[in-house]
């Protein structure tokens, strides 16, 4: 593994690169071609073209891209504070080892964030003020994948073990990041996962076309080679919690925000209504177990599908349903459509509040001829047919109104706007309401009003001695990059608790 070393403060290799080269994203397969499989569909650019993209980093005075600033209620810039200008320049200078070293200094799993992160960094890129931002996420992915392909990434086995044992409960991005950092410090780490495969959200919450599971398993194998243990199929109840707290020097709970938000409407008990997390997991598991041929999954084939929720998970469900062979798909969004371009009160470097058409929606447009999204609309009633099977959904339009009790703006139904849609499969992708109650109860922990484990900003220690928490379980539903950041921060706190100091950053 290359050493990050010290980098002398110098001018960027090509200060005029942003004026000479235009932005070029990784390639994208046409929608009607890529829906034929669950494979990833973004071939990478050539090395020569990638070097040009690295050269576009402009040696700006203040690299907002790595700042993670909260502006107007949203974060802009990288939560991991990646050394973005440095490794962009190393790409241009043809220094793959140094680029990799600088990237790995702050990022645990660039192969994940380089695929699924919404690129908060690019929203804050100085080039984006007047032109197109640098392809930071694609550059990140190039560095890490080039590192794997060239054999630059090898197991980093600690030379000395501390004699301390740490149990990490949950193997999603926060759990893996925490385990990786603690193992690096020489602690003996075991990760406990309730599912049949490690990876958590990365394995079963993100479809293969966005994150091939070979990529997840490659990282798990690397961590195993470095000394991290994994125990799957392990549900933590009261007895298991007692065992972990008695046998380990520290326990870190990284179980995510696992309680999905439900629909409270008439007919909710109809057969054919599923949460998005269960739908996506069943597809991925069936693909891994038998190539989706065994029929042991929630199928959208030949069905009229309605997806409740306009976020990334809802879009993932659209793309997955299309690959199943659904007859039609509609995606309901409660909020109004965002503008196509930035408004005057949403300037750079704020996160751009604009309408984004993601891959699943692109595929629906190409296949069915129209955007699947219906804005300012929600479900009012579910109708069952023979055998209690879902047969139709009644929707209603919404409008913004002031709640007199709270003074807040809420979405209220517009009388007389009801519509009936044929529907054989309803998928609820409305987000999550908090941490798993069963795990919290097992450790004697109470959730706060938001359903999360209470912990102050920058503090991952719970009210139970030697039990810590990180990721969505602590901060609520969020992004993979935030989960990784949380895991790294929690690892430093646990290390300090165990050793009296820490050199983890």
Whereabouts are the PLM-identified features?
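Glycine/serine-rich phosphate-binding loop and adjoining beta1-alpha1 elements at the start
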Residues: 51-55, 59-67, 73-158, 224, ...
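Beta1-alpha1 glycine-rich phosphate/pyrophosphate-binding loop at the start
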Residues: 19-25, 31-43, 55, 79-91, ...
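Feature captures the FAD/FMN-dependent oxidoreductase FAD-binding
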Residues: 98, 160, 165-169, 217-265, ...
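FAD-site-proximal beta/loop scaffold in flavoenzymes
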Residues: 269-302, 401-477
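Glycine-rich Rossmann-fold phosphate-binding loop(s) that bind the pyrophosphate
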Residues: 170-173, 309-311, 472
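Glycine-rich dinucleotide-binding loop and its adjacent helix/turn
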Residues: 142-160, 218-238, 260-324, 448-463
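Conserved hydrophobic helix-helix packing surfaces used for dimerization/oligomerization
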Residues: 166-168, 189, 305, 467
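A conserved FAD-binding loop/helix module that cradles the flavin
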Residues: 314-317, 324, 473-504
